[in-house]
Amino acid sequence: MQGYLQLLDEVLHDGIDRDDRTGVGTRSLFGRQMRFDLAEGFPLLTTKKLHIRSILHELLWFLRGDTNIGYLKENKVSIWDEWADEAGDLGPVYGHQWRSWEGANGDTVDQIAWVENEIRTNPRSRRLVVSAWNVADVPKMALPPCHLLFQFYVSGGRLSCQLYQRSADLFLGVPFNIASYAMLTSMMAHVTGLKPGEFVHTLGDVHLYSNHFDQAREQLSRTPRPLPTFHIKRDVASVTDFQFDDFELTNYDPHPHIKAPVAV
């Protein structure tokens, strides 16, 4: 995870201070990239403890095509609470776009099912892309997608994934995003008979909120520990068939959690 820590240090010391939508203020840079070889360990931060249950439940929630926080609340995950309406709805956010993208003609496309089939049948395709940025739906979303487009790539029996993230909350959000897409890559590789390759994380506006500076300094003062291992315990027919108990994380020995406020 040295690439993440180097980026955290770069933004903290070289970033440009800017006003932002939330009113908190940020220090940001534009256009950065990190690479993680999933064969070298699961990229979950060890310089602070992350809540792996929340990351996994959120990913399974996306893959269900769900956009109501009911499932998350049932599983004690609160990361979307601030954006949901009184009924728990968020509008046509990630899960809706992944599983039920609505075209101009009214037809819907299950992008996850499509890309899984393409990986199996046409692995050299350059069109192994899933997008959550449906321009017509953006005004209806409680929060437009931050991690908005990902592409798979098959080579040498390994499945790699590149994510483009337009807005990257470096202290709170990005560590979740790294782990989530590393999980998704591992899961997709498992069901398509491949091994996990690289996760490539491309960031647009990468920023630290002004009320995260002290927390970032504390994290940078800590020595990284060995990465954990992510195990998939069961074979399933499709990536959308996975359940929470199908996974196991071993040898995760992080430093203590660092609390920081969420900018809404």
From Swiss-Prot:
EC numbers on record: 2.1.1.45
Subcellular location(s) of the protein: Cytoplasm
Chemical reaction(s) catalysed: dUMP + (6R)-5,10-methylene-5,6,7,8-tetrahydrofolate = 7,8-dihydrofolate + dTMP
Any one Gene Ontology cellular component term annotated for this protein: cytosol
Pathways per UniProt: Pyrimidine metabolism; dTTP biosynthesis
GO molecular function annotations of the record: thymidylate synthase activity
Pfam families to which the protein is assigned, alphabetical: Thymidylat_synt (PF00303)
Assigned keywords, A-Z: Cytoplasm, Methyltransferase, Nucleotide biosynthesis, Transferase
GO biological process terms on file: dTMP biosynthetic process; dTTP biosynthetic process; methylation
Ligand binding ((6R)-5,10-methylene-5,6,7,8-tetrahydrofolate): 51, 169, 263
Main location: cytoplasm
Coiled-coil zones: none
Active-site residues (renumbered): 146
Sequence positions that bind dUMP: 21, 126-127, 166-169, 177, 207-209
Gene3D superfamilies per record: Thymidylate synthase/dCMP hydroxymethylase domain (3.30.572.10)
Tree of life domain: Bacteria
Family named by the database record: Belongs to the thymidylate synthase family. Bacterial-type ThyA subfamily.
Description of how the protein assembles with itself and partners: Homodimer.
Function according to Swiss-Prot or TrEMBL: Catalyzes the reductive methylation of 2'-deoxyuridine-5'-monophosphate (dUMP) to 2'-deoxythymidine-5'-monophosphate (dTMP) while utilizing 5,10-methylenetetrahydrofolate (mTHF) as the methyl donor and reductant in the reaction, yielding dihydrofolate (DHF) as a by-product. This enzymatic reaction provides an intracellular de novo source of dTMP, an essential precursor for DNA biosynthesis.
Protein name: Thymidylate synthase
Gene: thyA
